Every structure is written in structure tokens, then in C-alpha cells.
Curated annotation (Swiss-Prot):
Stored InterPro entries: aa-tRNA-synth_II, aa-tRNA-synth_II/BPL/LPL, Anticodon-bd, Anticodon-bd_dom_sf, His-tRNA-ligase, HisRS-like_core, HisRS/HisZ
Protein name: Histidine--tRNA ligase
GO biological processes: histidyl-tRNA aminoacylation
EC class name: ligase
Keyword annotations of the record: Aminoacyl-tRNA synthetase, ATP-binding, Cytoplasm, Ligase, Nucleotide-binding, Protein biosynthesis
Subunit details: Homodimer.
MF terms (GO), sorted A to Z: ATP binding; histidine-tRNA ligase activity
Gene Ontology cellular-component terms listed: cytoplasm
Catalytic activity entry: tRNA(His) + L-histidine + ATP = L-histidyl-tRNA(His) + AMP + diphosphate + H(+)
Main localization, broad class: cytoplasm
UniProt cross-references to CDD domains, sorted A to Z: HisRS-like_core
Domain of life: Bacteria
Length: 411
């Protein structure tokens, strides 16, 4: 029997984990400073949650979900994104009855059946935020600037915010109709999936990956030309706040994002460092999603950030050095010194990593272990310890010195 992994998944080995911790720690710190609380939702949910929220005509629902039946025949799906689960939790737990504004963040694995490529996997990890209960344009700006702050804290460069407005339920129908009329002229050029989208949700055609219709999309009607006064005022204020904060942005009239629930502001944060797949963060406003699930009228918005792609960027730009505490290897030359070795290890572990050798192995073997572990220092636990003295060897330079146990805390 050969043991392998399904395509599109990976092991995250110990050498890689410091990059994950770096991102998680920076993000958690910033989330909490912006008054977000962590939420953890199930990895699988009822399929209908995603069909209804993410959208029947999206690539995610039509082609990419991992859906299965449980032993009672219920349709379940591994979560392809984080927002629907957060909204379900908001409604099931009646958060809206106690908190007029709810700000949460999540970190965890998502699952989509798509073609694996650089920085993109079928099991991937996202961190994201959701804000429920605020419709003012300032919070759009704050959410975008929070995402930028995370990326800048990770020393990423060449960042640009791409932003658009998709309008609201009042002005969207006119835009949809114009889009439908435009693409109807080219119906025969559309794939069967895009022909279905033409009838059910023509906005999804703008998100199509079919290369044949890229030229058609260039001349398609733009949502900004159909905004009502309220949506235009909202969008103008978001842009003004970004400009006042000196954040680099450009208006992208064709940006619609790959989810059906977005309204008004949608955005991506891109970088030129990752080739074709250059969007690192994506998000937007979803003022009708809670109502879609039968809840009260509740404005909302959020973003999600792909961690695998972010780690790839961090490595490419090589601006951050991951440093571990020094590793001390305690080579025990006699079993009677184990108790002392444990006492010494407790002192050293206040600031350092410690590996304790085995007195049942020759000193030469223990030193080989120390070398294989890439130890920084070796402390020899031998008869000198009876005088409270230790011999320490710098395993990188070969330099040796003696130190009293009482001075270990100074290391």
C-alpha cells in the first residue's frame, strides 16, 4: 500500500509553522485592538446554508464545493468560505437582541475543489472579519484599512486597493437589466454555464474565467453608472476616507467578487509579487445577507485573507526573519545527575528552548544528537555540578566557558 496525499492538500511541517504563528499573532493583536472578538464555527454545515448565501450561480456552489451525505441522508458541505457560518451563528444565537454591533474574526481551514496552483490549495486557510450592524461608509474604510495594516505589519510591499460599488436593491435591477441586454447580443459566444448565469444572475458573467469573453467584459456596462444617489454618496465617502488616509487605491469598475451576496462596496487588495494570482485580500459589504436567511434587516461587511498565499508572499519578499529562542542541549554524563538537569532545564526554559539528553547513551552519541538538532549550546552535566558549576559550549563557534548555576538566568 502506498501512502500519499490527495491532490490540493499539504502537510504544514514544523519548519513552516513559525510563518503561520507570525501571521496569526499579528492578525489577532490587530483584530483585538480594533475591538473584534474571535468566533469558531463548524468546518461542515448544511449544504443549503452555502447555496442560499454564497449563491447558486457562483463558481463555488456550482463547481467547487465538497458536498456529501451523512448516514441519515442529509446533505452537508465542508465550508468553502467563512461568512455564511458566522451569519448562521449570529441568527441561531440571537446576537442581534443583545449587540447592535457585532465585530468578530475567524481563522481556519476552508475547502474548494479548484485547480491547485502556486499559493492555492483545495484545503486552504483563511483569516477574516465580519462586522454586523453598521451601514455607515466609515466602517467600510476601517475594514479596508485594517486589512492593509495587517499586510503592512508583515512588511508586504507593492500593495494596491482595488475598489468598486455594486449598488443596492434599489439601483441594482437597472444595472442587471443593462448587463443582461448587453450580453444577450453575444449569447452564442457564452459557455453553457454563462448562458445560465445570463438568465439568473448576469453579474456572475463579469466574474467568469472563460477567456473567450474577456474582450466582451471590457465593454460591458459598469455598475458605477447606475448607482442611486444614496449609493453614490456612500461610495464617494469611502473613497474620500481612503484618500485622506493616503491609502493607495484605484477604482475597478469590473470588480464584482465571486459571491452573490455583495452590495455596495467590494474590494480586493493586490500585489504584483505573486504573478497572475495577485489578490491577497478580498471583501465587501452584504447588507441583505442576514435577511436572506430569514433574519432582521442587518447591514454587514467583511474580508477574508488567504494564509497560504500570504506566506508565499512573505517568503518571496524576504523582509521578515523568523527567529527561534536559542536551543540548549543538556548532555548528561551520569544518571545520578538527572534531577539536577531537570532543575537547570526549568531555569533555562524561562527564555530558551531545552533538550535533555540521555545518560544511558555515550557522550559522543548525545553530542551527535545535539548536532542533528541544530543546537546553539551544549551544557555538560557532570561531576562539576556538585560544585554548582557548569561547562557550556557554544555549538556554533566551539567556544567553551564555565558558569555557576546561580548565573544561568543571565543567559
Amino acid at each position: 500500500m502506498s501512502i500519499g496525499l490527495p491532490r490540493g492538500v499539504q502537510d504544514i511541517l514544523p519548519d513552516e509553522i513559525p510563518f503561520w504563528h507570525l501571521i496569526e499573532n499579528i492578525a489577532r493583536s490587530l483584530f483585538e485592538k480594533y475591538n473584534y472578538e474571535e468566533i469558531r464555527t463548524p468546518i461542515f454545515e448544511f449544504t443549503e446554508l452555502f447555496v442560499k448565501g454564497t449563491g447558486e450561480t457562483t463558481d463555488i456552489v456550482m463547481k467547487e464545493m465538497y458536498t456529501f451525505q451523512d448516514k441519515k441522508g442529509r446533505s452537508l458541505t465542508l465550508r468553502p468560505e467563512g461568512t455564511p457560518g458566522v451569519i448562521r451563528a449570529y441568527l441561531m444565537n440571537k446576537i442581534y437582541t443583545t449587540k447592535p454591533i457585532w465585530k468578530v474574526y475567524y481563522i481556519g481551514p476552508m475547502f474548494r475543489y479548484e485547480r491547485p496552483q502556486s499559493g492555492r490549495y483545495r484545503q486552504f486557510h483563511q483569516l477574516g472579519v465580519e462586522v454586523l450592524g453598521r451601514k455607515d461608509p466609515y466602517i467600510d474604510f476601517e475594514v479596508i484599512s485594517l486589512a492593509v495594516e495587517i499586510l503592512k505589519s508583515l512588511k508586504l510591499e507593492n500593495l494596491e486597493i482595488e475598489i468598486n460599488s455594486l449598488g443596492c436593491l434599489k439601483c441594482r435591477p437597472a444595472y442587471r437589466e443593462a448587463l443582461k441586454n448587453y450580453f444577450y447580443q453575444y449569447k452564442d459566444l457564452l459557455s453553457p454555464i454563462d448562458q445560465e448565469r445570463l438568465e439568473r444572475n448576469p453579474l456572475r458573467i463579469l466574474d467568469s474565467k472563460d477567456e473567450k469573453i474577456i474582450p466582451l467584459k471590457e465593454n460591458a456596462p459598469q455598475p458605477l453608472d447606475f448607482l442611486c444617489n444614496d449609493c453614490k454618496d456612500h461610495f464617494d465617502k469611502v473613497l474620500r476616507y481612503l484618500q485622506e488616509a493616503s491609502l493607495n487605491f484605484k477604482i475597478s469598475p469590473k470588480l464584482v467578487r465571486g459571491l452573490d451576496y455583495y452590495t455596495r462596496t467590494v474590494f480586493e487588495i493586490t500585489t504584483t509579487s505573486l504573478g497572475a494570482q495577485n489578490a491577497v485580500v478580498g471583501g465587501g459589504r452584504y447588507d441583505n445577507l442576514v435577511e436572506t436567511y430569514g433574519g432582521p434587516s442587518t447591514p454587514g461587511l467583511g474580508f477574508a485573507l488567504g494564509m497560504e498565499r500570504l506566506i508565499l508572499l512573505i517568503k518571496q519578499q524576504d523582509k521578515i526573519k523568523i527567529e527561534k529562542p536559542s536551543l540548549f542541549f543538556l548532555a548528561i554524563e551520569n544518571e545520578k545527575y538527572i534531577k539536577k538537569a531537570v532543575e537547570i532545564s526549568k531555569i533555562l526554559r524561562i527564555n530558551h528552548r531545552v533538550e535533555i539528553g540521555s545518560p544511558n547513551e555515550p557522550l559522543r552519541t548525545q553530542l551527535k544528537w545535539a548536532d542533528k538538532l541544530n543546537s546553539d549550546y551544549v551544557i555538560f552535566i557532570n561531576q562539576m555540578i556538585e560544585k554548582d558549576i557548569l561547562r557550556i559550549k557554544n555549538f556554533k563557534t566551539g567556544e567553551e566557558k564555565e558558569i555557576r548555576i546561580e548565573n544561568l538566568k543571565e543567559l
